Amino acid sequence: MSLESVRYSRGSLQVLNQLLLPHKSEYEPVTGVQQGADAIRTMKVRGAPAIAIVGVLSLAVELTTKPCQDVPSLITFVRESLHHLVSARPTAVNMKKAADELNAFLAEEADKPGATSQRLTESVVQWAESLLKKDVEDNQMIGDFGAKHILEKAGPTEKVCMLTHCNTGSLATAGYGTALGVVRSLHALGRLSHVFCTETRPYNQGSRLTAYELVYEKIPATLITDSMASVTMRERKVTAVVVGADRVVANGDTANKIGTYQLAIIAKYHGIPFYVAAPSTSCDLSLPTGGSIVIEERPSHELTDINGIRIAAPGIDVWNPAFDVTPHELITGIITERGVFKPEELKDGLTKGQ
């Protein structure tokens, strides 16, 4: 059984405070939009899919427990709440796409004859709940598509060795995970020999969260420092690198956790395939290249301090971007719930049939 980043029933939302992991597992209530935005901004919950899910569910909870009295006030509240949630962490596109889709859905429902605040509230809540269910289904498909694709490149009985970065598992999504979902699927098939996970400085999502998930599920794994990636790829016969994404744009350029770009360069040098695993909700086809992606910058103390104890020299300047952009030329394939695409095939692959 996978870990849960969120626990939801209608009118009630709890998020696993990931700042306390791996030492303490504690779920905290989210009673409304402001608490949802705070949980996202402070990284109690993180991962592009999970951010969107917590965002829309926090809205659903507040609408359920504190319903609006008329249609105009409901529309205004939803629009302003979604804007606030999007601004909490702007690089991840999932929350922005969910906000745009929900605003459009609500406007369409409000134009129907007989629309009332009660009916519209029910529609919004159901929409938010459907996002939770769909994310788990999409992640399982990503895992299975990715595992199948990687195994097709291997021998018929060969086990594969993977390397991954940051945290892209159940803790970053509604369940199962994206890049870590691929690892899970390989393990379930009995075809995973080992996975290496990077510590992912400065927030240590790899050592705190990914390692926690891998130990929890008894998947054979080894934690490495970020600076060990080169020697690991060379010495440990890594089959492929698989990472997640906070935003993939039309040409395949990918924004992901800081350090992803250098992993792609190292993989290219060693002739190792480099895959991005992401749901279509993380793909922003409105941006032609990664140069337009807004990169969030985090506070300096996240780099200079650990658990409130300063480890860096006082007075040193700090640059702490949360993400970097990997050029599409370094990416072998993008694994989505609709299949695996080369970067240049992504836009057509995701728009076909729409």
UniProtKB/Swiss-Prot annotation:
Q: Where in the cell is it found?
A: Cytoplasm; Nucleus
Keyword check for Transmembrane helix: no
- What reaction is this protein's catalytic activity? 5-(methylsulfanyl)-alpha-D-ribose 1-phosphate = 5-(methylsulfanyl)-D-ribulose 1-phosphate
Q: Does the keyword Transport apply?
A: no
Q: What InterPro entries does UniProt report for this protein, alphabetically?
A: IF-2B-related (IPR000649), IF-M1Pi (IPR005251), IF_2B-like_C (IPR042529), Initiation_fac_2B_a/b/d (IPR011559), M1Pi_N (IPR027363), NagB/RpiA_transferase-like (IPR037171)
Coiled-coil segments, which residues?
A: none
Q: Where is the signal peptide?
A: none
Pathway assignment reads: Amino-acid biosynthesis; L-methionine biosynthesis via salvage pathway; L-methionine from S-methyl-5-thio-alpha-D-ribose 1-phosphate: step 1/6
The record ties this protein, via Pfam families, to: IF-2B (PF01008)
The Gene Ontology biological process annotation of the record reads: L-methionine salvage from methylthioadenosine
Q: What is its EC number?
A: 5.3.1.23
The protein's UniProt keywords, in alphabetical order, are: Amino-acid biosynthesis, Cytoplasm, Isomerase, Methionine biosynthesis, Nucleus
Q: Which residues form the active site?
A: 246
- The lineage's top-level taxon is Eukaryota
GO molecular function terms listed in the Swiss-Prot or TrEMBL record: S-methyl-5-thioribose-1-phosphate isomerase activity
**Catalytic class of the enzyme:** isomerase
Cellular component aspect of the GO annotation:
cytoplasm; nucleus
- Site positions for Transition state stabilizer: 166
Membrane-crossing segments per the record = none
Q: What does this protein do?
A: Catalyzes the interconversion of methylthioribose-1-phosphate (MTR-1-P) into methylthioribulose-1-phosphate (MTRu-1-P).
Q: Which family does it belong to?
A: Belongs to the eIF-2B alpha/beta/delta subunits family. MtnA subfamily.
Indicate what this protein is called per its UniProt record. Methylthioribose-1-phosphate isomerase
State the organism named in the record: Xenopus laevis
Traced from the root, the source organism's taxonomic lineage reads: Eukaryota, Metazoa, Chordata, Craniata, Vertebrata
**The gene coding this protein:** mri1
